[in-house]
């Protein structure tokens, strides 16, 4: 059935829709399936399924219903681009406080439309949120400024937070795990649980929390510097998440503000993120996105992009989210990911299709991880343009030839090298831990700095 007469209006102007402030706008890359309708007909069916319609006209439809139809307002068939305007009245709101929810946003904009028989694929690449709807989201309650404050740094441009993930990701018992934390903290700032770490039979949660608390206190006494840890509180059950968080805060006591809470936001979903945001508003909310590649990968033509995921995370209240390495690490990514980092940190930013004003909503910190080490960092910072972020380098720290503490120091020295505008090989001559990173990661060293062996007088590793 051709629904384009009802669910499409190509006379609408995007500027007018934005000025009106009553629509969420979404941009998709969509391809109709052969043998069905043309591009506009398929787009209109997609819009109907995403709002008030179905595959037939129903007798219960009235004038009010038609007034909240989602409408296709722009198409670019040559590039498979489709833009849809969703009236904000369509989106579900909390009964308890009238707030907006990402679950409803996803259900409409990327729900049943993903399984439509006449759509070969459709993927959301950007969305715009009008002020009236944006103000209904929680947004972050804490930011990187809170971590800088704990670390004793300026709360503006407080700089690079040197972090790691304890490796191996599974298999360490509580005391060896805590010992690895202590080792890294002798040179670094921040440690996170890897995403599967929790309450395994070989590493009971409470025992691990107590051991990490003791290791943090020893490291702080040894270095005279504050330290940070991000604990995974992800669970299927709201009460389990709260119980884990409360036990951590009780154990760390006067160091409670040194603790962040990590949530596997993609696999556990928006409800888990909101549980952490609302139950623990004083804690830094660390959004881990494990599993997101199933829909965000450039190889996947359905779902939504990593850019969309990060923008949703800011709305939900994530203090920080993993944003990849912009192609400088081991995970999928590209230099264009810089736009994602700016979208979640700035108050006014451009996405691939829409400009977004955040109206003073707190920023979300880019957390960089996935195959990074000291040698890759100068190029990464060049691409991003600043170093106000958290980096969690697992192998990049514990793969250092001299151990975790030296690995942490090499990461810090890499940022110092970049800020000084120095040549990395020349800088390494006066910075031992950074120099030893060349020996620790010779494959990267050969690729990035081909003459390093002669310049540093080092043998092949």
Curated annotation (Swiss-Prot):
- The EC number(s) this enzyme carries: 4.1.1.39
Enzyme class, first EC level, given as a word = lyase
* Cofactor remark: Binds 1 Mg(2+) ion per subunit.
What Pfam family does this protein match (any one)? RuBisCO_large
Top-level taxonomic group? Bacteria
PROSITE patterns, alphabetized: RUBISCO_LARGE
The feature of type site (Transition state stabilizer) is located at 330
Where N6-carboxylysine occurs along the chain?
192
Can you cite a GO biological process for this protein? reductive pentose-phosphate cycle
**Where are the coiled-coil regions?**
none
Instruction: List, from the UniProt record, the residues annotated as the active site of this protein.
Output: 167 (proton acceptor), 288 (proton acceptor)
Q: Which PANTHER family match?
A: RIBULOSE BISPHOSPHATE CARBOXYLASE, RIBULOSE BISPHOSPHATE CARBOXYLASE LARGE CHAIN
Q: What is said about its interaction partners and assembly?
A: Homodimer.
Similarity annotation? Belongs to the RuBisCO large chain family. Type II subfamily.
Identification of the protein by name: Ribulose bisphosphate carboxylase
């Amino acid at each position: 059935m051709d629904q384009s007469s009802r669910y499409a209006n190509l006379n609408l102007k995007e500027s007018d829709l934005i000025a009106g402030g009553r629509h969420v706008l979404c941009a998709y890359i969509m391809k109709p399936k052969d043998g069905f309708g043309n591009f506009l007909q398929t787009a209109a069916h997609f819009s109907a399924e995403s709002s008030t319609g179905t595959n037939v006209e129903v007798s219960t439809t009235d004038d009010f219903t038609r007034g909240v139809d989602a409408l296709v307002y722009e198409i670019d068939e040559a590039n498979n681009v489709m833009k849809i305007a969703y009236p904000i009245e369509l989106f579900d709101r909390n009964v308890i406080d009238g707030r907006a929810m990402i679950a409803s946003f996803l259900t409409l904009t990327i729900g049943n439309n993903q399984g439509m028989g006449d759509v070969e694929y459709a993927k959301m690449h950007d969305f715009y949120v009008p002020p009236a709807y944006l103000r209904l989201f929680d947004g972050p309650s804490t930011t990187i400024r809170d971590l800088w404050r704990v670390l004793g740094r300026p709360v503006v441009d407080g700089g690079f937070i040197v972090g790691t993930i304890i490796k191996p990701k599974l298999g360490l018992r509580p005391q060896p795990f805590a010992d690895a934390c202590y080792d890294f903290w002798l040179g670094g700032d921040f440690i996170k649980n890897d995403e599967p770490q929790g309450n395994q039979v070989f590493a009971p949660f409470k025992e691990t929390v107590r051991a990490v608390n003791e290791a943090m206190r020893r490291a702080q006494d040894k270095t005279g510097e504050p330290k940070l840890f991000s604990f995974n509180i992800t669970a299927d059950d709201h009460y389990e998440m709260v119980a884990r968080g409360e036990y951590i805060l009780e154990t760390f006591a006067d160091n409670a503000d040194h603790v962040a809470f990590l949530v596997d936001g993609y696999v556990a979903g928006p409800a888990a993120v909101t549980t952490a945001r609302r139950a623990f508003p004083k804690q830094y909310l660390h959004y881990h996105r494990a599993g997101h590649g199933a829909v965000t990968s450039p190889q996947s033509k359905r779902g939504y992009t990593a850019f969309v995921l990060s923008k949703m995370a800011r709305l939900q209240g994530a203090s920080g989210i993993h944003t990849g390495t912009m192609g400088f690490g081991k995970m999928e990514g590209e230099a264009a990911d810089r736009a994602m980092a700016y979208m979640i940190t700035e108050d006014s930013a451009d996405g691939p299709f829409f400009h977004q004003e955040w109206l003073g909503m707190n920023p979300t910190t880019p957390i960089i991880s996935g195959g990074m080490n000291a040698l890759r960092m100068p190029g990464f910072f060049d691409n991003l343009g600043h170093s106000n972020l958290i980096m969690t380098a697992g192998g990049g720290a514990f793969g250092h030839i001299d151990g975790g503490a030296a690995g942490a120091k090499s990461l810090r020295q890499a940022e110092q090298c970049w800020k000084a505008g120095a040549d990395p090989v020349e800088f390494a001559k006066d910075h031992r831990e950074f120099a030893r990173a060349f020996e620790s990661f010779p494959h990267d060293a050969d690729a990035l700095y081909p003459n390093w062996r002669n310049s540093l007088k080092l043998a092949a590793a």
